[in-house]
């Protein structure tokens, strides 16, 4: 049985011990679904970490977005430093899928920018699932999208043992089959170099170590892991397994067989299009498909090879695609964080993808089999999902219908109770809000304000600013990195008030916020549903003086339900505190970027002395970098400098550069 070593100085408290006991009991009893109804600040992640350490099963943690995934990755990495905590999210910094707009006869080519570091982390995640039982994978909805099948992927792996009989040329051919490239000058991920009988291989899934294979005649004399930057040998190895550069690597015989099937489908489709007098579409399809076949024959892959995934994986028409779920062992556990958001996301992916692909097929840009390159449908996801724990402060209808058990975690370990709720008239909401802000600012506390529209948030920000309030606003036009920095500045006290619309909700951890003001709370709709109201009110639940003000001229059904649920929780929390003699304590957390919480593989713990000048230069750049493209550009510049310094044998300076690259990659995690 795998050992999960939970490292923490905290003991479960409040409702946590009972919640952990019930969840473990439910899993052991074979319950397919359970819900952890945990209020904001009750330590849901800590409870789940305790459950994982007790049941000792590989776990997939599904988060609704990259920001929360990065936060969870950092927390689990801290809880389980000796286990395989991995990160599996979309590796696209930018993605424009191919599409056709018939009304204007416009074809949009697929355009994408792949983040090399995230790709490495994805490969590391699947390797951990295949090799280890103590794996925790933090992921987003990208886990339901097609991935190379685990059977094909495993057929391509290469095992090398010390003492093996191995011809050097055969080894190099096998590396080429894994899509590794030879590069004797620039040693990077998924490359190898040859120096006499010594072959250095940089594994595709590694960011820390390369492998040195030393041959004596046709025998593997030595295997060792070494630092690819300094060349320092880290340890000797008895054996090592090399995985392909990509999840989509296909054995040559499978590729040839797939190409024959593609030709058969192409012929059938061309006959159909010509019978419908769609000659332009037929000519277009034939030209594009034959070009792809030529590329596959010569190179082993082509651009858009995922559109032929049905043949490459040997699936029948309409079968679900292989995904990350296929890499999970049968006894795995699925934890869905903020399930009221994550579960609907899973259901929404299929339809949007389908409508775009149907247009491409109809107008001759793709074969009908391209429709099978898709995310899983919701029913397919339900069928393949292992035992599941839904985690949310406001579970949705799906969780309510499916959960075999609902476990409440309402009492916080700190003794903090849910905020008091006041209802005030909407007619004078702005002036009343201004006076409340001045009271909080005088106490050095922060305020969150939610509005209904982007225009209103900007106008309110201008109004408050004109009246001497230090204020910023937050909405969807602001990119993820800047969004995190704004939240960080609020916590640091750079400003006192943050105005937003729908972004001030799930997962935001801001203990300094003592007041949440909800404007126009009586406008029924998505932004003022009972779940939205409870989530927004919860942002003040980490502060000892937490309070929520709802500005409304009438009490809606959603308000009534939200207030009723909050009062129910308050009563339970206060009763628990009285019974156990607990005095509520405020939460104090170090102010750090969410991304800094995610310790990325590659950021070393060794403290390096090194070029002060380079450090100053990089610190100056760091404040200027905002968008993912700027950060990626900076990473590429630093990597070039780093490799040049390594070639010049200036290893201290190169290590300094590497540490800077590690910090920048952490910032990219949540983008």
From Swiss-Prot:
Region (Disordered): 601-624
An individual GO BP term: SOS response
PROSITE patterns: HELICASE_ATP_BIND_1, HELICASE_CTER, UVR
UVR domain ranges (all copies): 632-667
Signal peptide: none
All copies of domain Helicase C-terminal, residue ranges: 429-582
Keyword set includes Cytoplasm: yes
UniProt cross-references to SMART domains, sorted A to Z: DEXDc, HELICc
UniProt superkingdom: Bacteria
Subunit structure of this chain's protein: Forms a heterotetramer with UvrA during the search for lesions. Interacts with UvrC in an incision complex.
Homology family: Belongs to the UvrB family.
Domain notes: The beta-hairpin motif is involved in DNA binding.
Protein's recorded name: UvrABC system protein B
Gene from which this protein is expressed: uvrB
């Amino acid at each position: 049985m795998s050992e999960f070593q939970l490292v923490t100085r905290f003991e479960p408290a409040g409702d946590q011990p009972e919640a952990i006991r019930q969840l473990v009991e439910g899993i052991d009893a074979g319950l397919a679904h359970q819900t952890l109804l945990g209020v904001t600040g009750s330590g849901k992640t800590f409870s789940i970490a305790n459950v994982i350490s007790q049941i000792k099963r590989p776990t997939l943690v599904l988060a609704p977005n990259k920001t929360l995934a990065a936060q969870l990755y950092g927390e689990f990495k801290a809880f389980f430093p000796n286990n395989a905590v991995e990160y599996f999210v979309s590796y696209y910094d930018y993605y424009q899928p191919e599409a056709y707009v018939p009304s204007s006869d416009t074809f949009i080519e697929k355009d994408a920018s792949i983040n090399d570091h995230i790709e490495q982390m994805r490969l590391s995640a699947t390797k951990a699932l295949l090799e280890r039982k103590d794996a925790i994978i933090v992921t987003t909805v990208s886990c339901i999208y097609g991935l190379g099948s685990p059977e094909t992927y495993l057929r391509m792996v290469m095992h090398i043992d010390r003492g093996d009989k191995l011809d050097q040329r055969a080894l190099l051919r096998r590396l080429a089959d894994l899509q590794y490239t030879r590069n004797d000058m620039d040693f990077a991920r998924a490359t190898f170099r040859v120096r006499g009988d010594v072959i250095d291989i940089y594994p595709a899934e590694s960011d820390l170590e390369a492998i040195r294979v030393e041959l004596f005649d046709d025998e593997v004399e030595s295997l060792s892991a070494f630092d690819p930057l300094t060349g320092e040998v880290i340890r000797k190895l008895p054996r090592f397994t090399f995985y392909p550069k990509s999840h989509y690597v296909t054995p040559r015989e499978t590729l040839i067989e797939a190409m024959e099937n593609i030709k058969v489908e192409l012929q059938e489709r061309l006959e159909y299009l010509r019978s419908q007098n769609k000659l332009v579409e037929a000519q277009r399809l034939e030209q594009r498909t034959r070009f792809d076949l030529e590329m596959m024959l010569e190179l082993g892959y082509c651009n858009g090879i995922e559109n032929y995934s049905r043949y490459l994986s040997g699936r029948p028409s309409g079968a679900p695609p292989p995904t990350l779920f296929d890499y999970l062992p049968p006894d795995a556990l699925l934890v869905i964080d903020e399930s009221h958001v994550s579960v609907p996301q899973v259901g929404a992916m299929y339809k949007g993808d389908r409508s775009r692909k149907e247009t491409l097929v109809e107008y001759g840009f793709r074969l009908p089999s391209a429709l099978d390159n898709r995310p899983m449908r919701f029913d397919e996801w339900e069928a393949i999902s292992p035992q599941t724990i839904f985690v949310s402060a406001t579970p949705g209808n799906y969780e309510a219908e499916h959960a075999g058990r609902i476990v409440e975690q309402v009492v916080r370990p700190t003794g903090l109770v849910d905020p008091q709720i006041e209802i005030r008239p909407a007619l004078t909401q702005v002036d009343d809000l201004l006076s409340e802000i001045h009271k909080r600012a005088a106490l050095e506390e922060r305020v969150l304000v939610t509005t209904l529209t982007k225009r209103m948030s900007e106008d309110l920000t201008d109004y408050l600013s004109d009246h001497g309030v230090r204020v910023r606003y937050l909405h969807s036009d602001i990119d993820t990195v800047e969004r995190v920095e704004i939240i960080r500045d609020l916590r640091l006290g750079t400003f006192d008030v943050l105005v937003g619309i729908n972004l001030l909700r799930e997962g935001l951890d801001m203990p300094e916020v003592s007041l949440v003001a909800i404007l126009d709370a009586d406008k029924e709709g998505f932004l003022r549903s009972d779940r939205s109201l409870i989530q927004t009110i919860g942002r003040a639940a980490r502060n000892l003086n937490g309070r929520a003000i709802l500005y409304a001229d009438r009490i809606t059904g959603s308000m009534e339900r939200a207030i009723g649920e909050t009062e129910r929780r308050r009563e339970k929390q206060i009763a628990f505190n009285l019974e156990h003699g607990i005095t509520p304590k405020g939460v104090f957390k170090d102010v750090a970027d969410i991304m800094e919480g995610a310790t990325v593989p590659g950021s070393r713990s060794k403290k390096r002395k090194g070029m002060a000048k380079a450090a100053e230069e990089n610190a100056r750049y760091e404040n200027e970098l905002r968008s993912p493209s700027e950060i990626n550009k900076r990473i590429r510049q630093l990597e070039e400098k780093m490799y040049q310094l390594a070639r010049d044998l200036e290893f201290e300076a190169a290590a300094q550069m590497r540490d800077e690259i590690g910090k920048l990659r952490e910032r990219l995690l949540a983008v």
